[in-house]
Amino acid sequence: MREAIIKRAAKELKEGMYVNLGIGLPTLVANEVSGMNIVFQSENGLLGIGAYPLEGGVDADLINAGKETITVVPGASFFNSADSFAMIRGGHIDLAILGGMEVSQNGDLANWMIPKKLIKGMGGAMDLVHGAKKVIVIMEHCNKYGESKVKKECSLPLTGKGVVHQLITDLAVFEFSNNAMELVELQEGVSLDQVKEKTEAEFEVHL
């Protein structure tokens, strides 16, 4: 299920892109890049993230914004968070791939908190959804109770309003334009009826 999401998201990466991968599921996209010159950026001050380290090759001083150990590629650079967010807010990041708790049919995103649950803070997502040239959200289509996370309106606090360009789930791929949500692709083995059944949001079909 997650593998299908990650592999589909990796297809959106293009040669020469500067890309920020959000915490959690999005970080796994970096492992799918092979033979392309993609530069991955992290909010904690790193340009040039590599794949996850193999066992025995972990450097505890090399971490991403989610405090996971990583590797770096030749030519990687390190800098402070102020410079990192200047890159993001200045529009220098081509693509941000973020996780999501809910996405609405208008392209609203909620991905930073659930009320009454302890959180560490909002992180860099609010900057990324407004600063990156394109925002892709990847997530499972339904929550653990089987309820759709693709909503008419988000019920959780918003990260950004009308900021999502593309949504990739384990069932389908949606694109957003002019406040309309369009189904453009089905995941392998998934039917249109399944997507309609599991989606609260209203969408147009452009398969």
UniProtKB/Swiss-Prot annotation:
Name of the protein this chain belongs to: Succinyl-CoA:3-ketoacid coenzyme A transferase subunit B
Q: Which SMART domains match?
A: CoA_trans
Output the Pfam families linked to this UniProt entry. Answer: CoA_trans
Its keywords, alphabetically, are: Transferase
Q: Which reaction does it catalyse?
A: a 3-oxo acid + succinyl-CoA = a 3-oxoacyl-CoA + succinate
Q: Which EC main class describes this enzyme?
A: transferase
Q: Does Protease count among this protein's keywords?
A: no
Quaternary structure note: Heterodimer of a subunit A and a subunit B.
Q: GO MF annotations for this entry?
A: succinyl-CoA:3-oxo-acid CoA-transferase activity
Q: Which InterPro entries match?
A: 3-oxoacid_CoA-transf_B, CoA_trans_fam_I, CoA_transf_AS, NagB/RpiA_transferase-like
The UniProt record lists the EC number as 2.8.3.5
Active-site residues per Swiss-Prot or TrEMBL entry: 43
Family per similarity comment: Belongs to the 3-oxoacid CoA-transferase subunit B family.
